[in-house]
């Protein structure tokens, strides 16, 4: 056991973890690039309502949550590397469906259907990618550094959102939706080339509890994560339309502000969950997220909205890893992939449900109301986290 622990903390293991995280960054650009563009494509080019915008964005996360169990079993039983590489391939295929939606001379309903197919494929790929890379990273550096694994992967994900959002709007405005789709096809292939030679980690043996018994161990941190996720979901789905409705520019840079603050917090304070435990870090983070969403709700100018997005990103930054540390503590090694997949599924459910519900809210009460709803959810998340872990 000592030999294994020493091996998992070598510089070579850290470099392998970096390669995995950078590959996640490249692959997750397939999420970041189209995220601010899809609402514009659905609402303005296809002529559909806010609710349909919410469905187009949110359905990806339903696909992700429905395949989390499969992704966890794949990582636990057949190896995390296989799960991660399979996810990259699926993310690339999503771009092919969007390319067909852009190029085929078909009606708006058919284009929308192809867009949905691509979102479903992307959701499937995302579940394999994230579950695989988290389990892979834990196998490389060890469970005592689970916070680091989650922090690095989180930086990669939200760094991709920060870079991808304005780049996606730029590509779309200058070259069209087809060029955006083609770009999303290529990036996962580059990611595969970058980390394909990182060593495998063995699958753990031992008795494997049922999925529902694992969920019983992780639902409390998962619920806190889900309530946190509402804030990002409303920003990712409606920030472009919110800016357009106010006549503001720089909508893509809102996600850059969110993602940049997210990554900066991970760089400066990513060590905190391992050092202080997840609960305290999560509660403070949810307070910061609440402040950012309230600022977005009340923003009189684009610059204030950017500050609100940055505060929200700073608040969201450490919550996944903070509560994820609690998940790793609660489950045996042979089901870590299943547990992490199930834990992340709570966030996927939040993203998926928030899109269409927030769309109906925006139609009835205007775009600012969705950010107020996100702030209320974060406050509920604080209460849930405190009450769930009060005995600890």
UniProtKB/Swiss-Prot annotation:
Localization of this protein: Cell inner membrane
GO-annotated cellular components: plasma membrane
Residues annotated as transmembrane: 22-42, 46-66, 97-117, 121-141, 151-171, 174-194, 224-244, 252-272, 276-298, 342-362, 369-389
Annotated Gene3D superfamilies: MFS general substrate transporter like domains (1.20.1250.20)
GO MF entries: transmembrane transporter activity
Membrane topology (UniProt): Multi-pass membrane protein
Keyword set includes Transport: yes
Principal localisation: membrane
Entry keywords, A to Z: Cell inner membrane, Cell membrane, Membrane, Transmembrane, Transmembrane helix, Transport
PROSITE patterns: MFS (PS50850)
One Pfam family of this chain: MFS_1
InterPro entries the record matches: MFS, MFS_dom, MFS_trans_sf, MFS_Transporters, MFS_YfcJ
Keyword set includes Transmembrane helix: yes
Family in the record: Belongs to the major facilitator superfamily. YfcJ family.
HAMAP family documented for this protein: MFS_YfcJ (MF_02091)
NCBIfam families in the cross-refs: PRK05122.1 (NF003477), PRK12382.1 (NF009048)
Record protein name field: Uncharacterized MFS-type transporter YfcJ
Organism: Salmonella typhi
Upper taxonomic lineage: Bacteria, Pseudomonadati, Pseudomonadota, Gammaproteobacteria, Enterobacterales
């Amino acid at each position: 056991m000592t030999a294994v622990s020493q091996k998992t903390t070598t510089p070579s293991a850290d470099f392998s973890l970096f390669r995995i995280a950078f590959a996640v960054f490249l692959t997750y650009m397939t999420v970041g690039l189209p995220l601010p563009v899809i609402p514009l494509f659905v609402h303005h080019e296809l002529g559909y309502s806010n609710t349909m915008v919410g469905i187009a964005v949110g359905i990806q996360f339903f696909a992700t949550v429905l395949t989390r169990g499969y992704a966890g079993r794949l990582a636990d039983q057949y190896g995390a590397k296989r799960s991660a590489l399979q996810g990259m391939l699926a993310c690339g295929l999503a771009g092919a469906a969007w390319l067909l939606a852009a190029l085929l001379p078909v009606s708006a309903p058919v284009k929308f259907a192809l867009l949905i197919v691509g979102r479903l494929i992307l959701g499937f790929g995302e579940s394999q990618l994230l579950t695989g890379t988290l389990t892979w990273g834990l196998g490389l550096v060890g469970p005592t550094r689970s916070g680091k694994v989650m922090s690095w992967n989180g930086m990669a994900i939200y760094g991709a959102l920060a870079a991808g959002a304005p780049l996606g709007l730029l590509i779309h405005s200058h070259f069209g939706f087809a060029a955006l789709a083609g770009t999303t096809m290529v990036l996962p292939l580059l990611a595969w080339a970058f980390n394909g030679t990182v060593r495998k980690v063995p699958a753990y043996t031992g008795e494997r509890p049922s999925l529902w018994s694992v969920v019983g161990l992780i639902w409390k941190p998962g619920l806190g994560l889900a309530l946190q996720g509402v804030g990002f979901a409303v920003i990712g789905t409606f920030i472009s339309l919110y800016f357009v409705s106010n006549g503001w520019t720089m909508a893509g840079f809102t996600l850059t502000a969110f993602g940049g603050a997210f990554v900066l917090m991970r760089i400066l304070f990513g060590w905190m969950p391992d050092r202080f435990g997840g609960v305290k870090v999560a509660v403070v983070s949810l307070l910061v997220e609440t402040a950012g969403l309230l600022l977005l709700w009340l923003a009189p100018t684009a610059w204030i909205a950017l500050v609100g997005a940055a505060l929200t990103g700073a608040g969201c930054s450490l919550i996944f890893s903070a509560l994820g540390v609690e998940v790793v503590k609660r489950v045996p090694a042979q089901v870590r992939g299943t547990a992490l997949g199930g834990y992340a599924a709570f966030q996927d459910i939040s993203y998926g449900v928030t899109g269409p519900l927030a769309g109906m809210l925006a139609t009835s009460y205007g775009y600012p109301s969705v950010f107020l709803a996100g702030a209320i959810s974060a406050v509920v998340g604080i209460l849930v986290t405190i009450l769930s872990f009060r005995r600890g």
